[in-house]
């Protein structure tokens, strides 16, 4: 008989709307003794069935729902169906843009909570962030090896969120032979070097693909400051689009070395590109004090808020950095600014940038609102999947 999780009265509403998380404070009692990652059934207080998911005893999110179909068993066939559906959902995008790098599985938004899979040419990189994902690792690897026989499979489950599940970090080769790093992917006709072993996240920020192309529309014959540049891909797009000068800024010398490589693999001269290993906050203040200005500035910082307690501090950080960036823009210049925190509402982010403009004594116009690329879908019942917010603002 299935292990059963009964909810407290009134706590079934989010599951009836198909939100895939059950928090610990919503649970009334547990019938049975589930092991970490084991499949459990969730029922309302009156006993009616709600969903079937994975048990995470050490997490605040104690059940992550695999399915809302009572007839659907959680077995090898279930994961095969989910993986096939995820690939079908990307096929149009791959054909249209000629992609060799894309997000294959976007966790909850693809009905596979805790599972992220990115494809970089013939390397699949898995990030397993929950006990349920961890339990089904071997099955996932078998299925991926069958569906993608030419691909190596590498794991990058080395993120802090695993600690909340009581899991240790895991990295390493799961299947096949890993090619020499970096691997080269292509998007929008541009080649990009990706190191799946040492790179951020699974190796690269695939979610900014569309925004890199949008940024390129504003840069011809312009001076571009690319902040938190990582491997320099906003700058790479700018170089191809005819920017007059580009400054790529990051604290990582390894990232900047890859930024140089990206120019080389695309056959682009970097005579007009400056690579600056520096702290962005300090550098922007320095440039303001020196009276230095730019035509286009890209702000793509790391996440400022990992939890709600950090949100107020994140708001101050976003306001400060956007204020200084706006002070560095020439009249008519363009700021592309981003927040990758799922806790930051899009409207609040826009208000922060508007307030930053007031403090900077600049008049701005919001000319585009940006989000993550379409291979990072947002489930209709999972608003948390909308994490990347961006704005394009023109300053006068």
Curated annotation (Swiss-Prot):
Annotated SMART domains: PUA (SM00359)
EC id: 2.1.1.191
Residues in the signal sequence: none
Domain PUA span(s) in chain numbering: 2-79
Gene Ontology CC annotations of this record: cytoplasm
Top-level EC class as recorded in UniProt: transferase
Record keywords: Cytoplasm, Methyltransferase, RNA-binding, rRNA processing, S-adenosyl-L-methionine, Transferase
Location in the cell: Cytoplasm
A Pfam family per the record: Methyltrans_SAM
HAMAP family listed in its UniProt record: 23SrRNA_methyltr_I (MF_01857)
Similarity annotation: Belongs to the methyltransferase superfamily. RlmI family.
Name by which UniProt lists this protein: Ribosomal RNA large subunit methyltransferase I
Upper taxonomic lineage: Bacteria, Pseudomonadati, Pseudomonadota, Gammaproteobacteria, Alteromonadales
Gene name linked to the record: rlmI
């Amino acid at each position: 008989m299935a292990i059963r999780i009964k909810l407290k009265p009134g706590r079934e509403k989010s599951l009836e709307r198909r939100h895939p998380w059950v928090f610990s404070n919503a649970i009334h009692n547990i019938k049975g003794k589930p092991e970490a990652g084991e499949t459990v059934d969730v029922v309302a207080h009156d006993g009616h069935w709600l969903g079937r998911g994975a048990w995470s005893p050490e997490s605040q999110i104690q059940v992550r729902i695999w399915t809302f179909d009572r007839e659907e068993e959680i077995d090898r066939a279930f994961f095969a169906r989910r993986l096939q559906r995820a690939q079908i959902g990307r096929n149009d995008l791959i054909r249209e843009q000629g992609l060799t790098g894309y997000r294959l599985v976007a966790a909850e938004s693809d009905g596979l909570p805790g599972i992220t899979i990115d494809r970089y040419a013939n390397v699949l990189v898995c990030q397993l962030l929950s006990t349920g994902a961890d339990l089904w690792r071997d099955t996932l690897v078998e299925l991926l090896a069958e569906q993608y026989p030419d691909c190596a499979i590498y794991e990058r489950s080395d993120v802090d969120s695993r600690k909340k599940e009581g899991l240790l970090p895991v990295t390493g080769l799961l299947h096949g032979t890993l090619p020499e790093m970096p691997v080269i992917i292509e998007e929008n006709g541009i080649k990009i070097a990706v190191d799946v072993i040492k790179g951020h996240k699974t190796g690269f920020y695939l979610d900014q693909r569309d925004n890199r192309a949008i940024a390129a529309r504003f840069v011809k014959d312009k001076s571009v400051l690319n902040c938190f540049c990582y491997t320099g891909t906003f700058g790479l797009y700018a170089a191809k689009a005819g920017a007059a000068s580009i400054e790529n800024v990051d604290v990582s010398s390894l990232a900047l070395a890859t930024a140089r490589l990206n120019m080389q693999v695309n056959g682009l001269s970097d005579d007009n590109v400056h690579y600056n290993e520096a702290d962005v906050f300090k550098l922007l203040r320095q440039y303001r004090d020196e009276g230095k200005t730019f035509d286009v500035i890209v702000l793509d910082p790391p996440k400022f808020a990992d939890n709600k307690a950090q949100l107020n501090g994140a708001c101050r950080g976003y306001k400060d950095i956007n204020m200084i960036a706006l002070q560095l823009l020439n009249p008519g210049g363009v700021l592309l600014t981003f927040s990758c925190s799922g806790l930051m509402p899009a409207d609040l982010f826009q208000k922060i940038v508007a307030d930053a403009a007031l403090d900077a004594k600049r008049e701005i116009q919001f000319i585009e609102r940006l989000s993550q690329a379409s291979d990072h879908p947002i489930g209709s019942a999972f608003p948390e999947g909308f994490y990347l917010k961006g704005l394009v603002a023109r300053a006068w």
